[in-house]
């Protein structure tokens, strides 16, 4: 196509995937794992009969779900160094870096969404199963760990994966703190070689292929879970 040079993509593939996509996938996996763990804890807090705990978790979830992600990224990027200085009793802000700030941001932000998913999963389990656990001599935490959470997690796997696809796409926002994710790496190449259309078109195709492929996996899981039920 006249005026376009798509060879720049081939020349930059190594950098884009070695540095950019590795950053994106690693951040996605870490934020997914830690976000689900923290989100499950938040879900249990929201379902707690102790009202102050339930209200605290609810306030956190509502706060995170009401603020644009890009603002949360900025907030943690500039705030975490001061929190680190306070914890370590340092006179100056602690140097944290874009990577750690991104991990903390996405863990804290996505936990609010994973919380609501896990809360729905826990509430979908028949109350009788909880009482059965107590009848067997299990305490609350054992009942949740051995009976309720495994079933809730299995039921919610498709929804959790759907949220993870959104998380994968949202990681592209870390470019605002100069992190070199897949989009950030493409932006550097685009600005260096003045090939914005070519690079951003390629990035869009890659995100579409990965996200659409994962959505097909989610659909297949939903069908399998429906059959098991």
Regions found by a protein language model. Give the residues of each.
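Transmembrane alpha-helices and adjacent helix-loop boundaries
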Residues: 1-229
């Amino acid at each position: 196509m006249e005026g376009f040079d798509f060879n720049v993509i081939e020349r930059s593939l190594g950098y884009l995937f070695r540095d950019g996509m590795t950053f994106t996938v690693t951040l996605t996996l870490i934020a997914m794992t830690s976000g689900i763990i923290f989100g499950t804890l938040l879900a249990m807090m929201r379902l707690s009969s102790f009202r102050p705990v339930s209200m605290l978790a609810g306030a956190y979830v509502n706060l995170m779900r009401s603020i644009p992600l890009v603002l949360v990224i900025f907030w943690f990027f500039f705030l975490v160094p001061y929190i680190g200085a306070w914890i370590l009793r340092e006179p100056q802000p602690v140097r944290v870096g874009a990577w750690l700030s991104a991990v903390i941001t996405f863990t804290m932000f996505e936990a609010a969404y994973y919380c609501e998913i896990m809360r729905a999963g826990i509430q979908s389990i028949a109350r009788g199963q909880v009482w059965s656990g107590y009848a067997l001599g299990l305490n609350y935490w054992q009942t949740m760990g051995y009976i309720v959470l495994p079933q809730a997690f299995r039921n919610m796997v498709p929804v959790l994966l759907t949220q993870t696809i959104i998380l994968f796409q949202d990681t592209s926002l870390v470019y605002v703190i100069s992190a070199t994710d897949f989009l950030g790496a493409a932006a550097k190449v685009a600005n260096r070689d003045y090939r914005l259309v070519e690079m951003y078109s390629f990035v869009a195709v890659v995100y579409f292929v990965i996200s659409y492929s994962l959505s097909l996996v989610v659909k297949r899981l939903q069908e399998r879970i429906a059959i098991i039920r």
